[in-house]
């Protein structure tokens, strides 16, 4: 029997809606990364983007275990000499709550052009409202 490979014309993408309220950040990010890659589908093909679109709401209510709310630190560099910046999880959630989930999921996707196209299918919103009602996303429980 020949190995199955998905064809771009045969890939059916769905829109999934996930509520991040009281979900642990890492466990949520793992499930979302699997959906974005398409590993939850039988037609998964490693060199193709077979994943679904994911809309995450209530990003500001995501949970972390232990002392991570105060102790977890995110770093980025401005590009200038001595330009390393850091922000705690607590401050990041207060200012840009969607970035914490985006950074967690981004770290679980491949660091290739294919991984970047997979990441573009992730839509994260701080509150309950989102502009994707026309796509009729299906509620997905984690």
Swiss-Prot record:
This protein's record includes keyword Ribonucleoprotein: yes
Highest taxon above the source species: Bacteria
Any Gene Ontology biological process: translation
GO CC annotations, alphabetized: cytosolic large ribosomal subunit
GO molecular-function term, one example from the UniProt record: structural constituent of ribosome
Classification via SUPFAM superfamilies: Ribosomal protein L13
Keywords: Ribonucleoprotein, Ribosomal protein
Keyword Ribonucleoprotein: yes
Subunit-structure text: Part of the 50S ribosomal subunit.
Family: Belongs to the universal ribosomal protein uL13 family.
Described function: This protein is one of the early assembly proteins of the 50S ribosomal subunit, although it is not seen to bind rRNA by itself. It is important during the early stages of 50S assembly.
Protein name: Large ribosomal subunit protein uL13
Annotated source species: Francisella tularensis subsp. holarctica (strain LVS)
């Amino acid at each position: 029997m020949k190995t199955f490979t998905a064809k771009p014309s045969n890939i059916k993408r769905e829109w999934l809606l996930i509520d991040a309220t009281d979900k642990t950040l890492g466990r949520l990010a793992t499930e979302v990364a699997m959906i974005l890659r398409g590993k939850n589908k039988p037609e998964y093909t490693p060199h193709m983007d077979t994943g679904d679109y994911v809309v995450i709401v209530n990003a500001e209510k995501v949970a972390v275990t232990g002392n991570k709310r105060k102790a977890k630190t995110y770093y980025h560099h401005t590009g200038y000499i001595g330009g390393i910046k850091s922000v705690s999880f607590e401050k990041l959630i207060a200012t840009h709550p969607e970035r914490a989930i985006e950074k967690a999921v981004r770290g679980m996707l491949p660091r290739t052009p294919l991984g970047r196209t997979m990441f573009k299918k992730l839509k994260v919103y701080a509150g309950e409202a989102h502009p994707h009602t026309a796509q009729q996303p299906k509620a997905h429980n984690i």
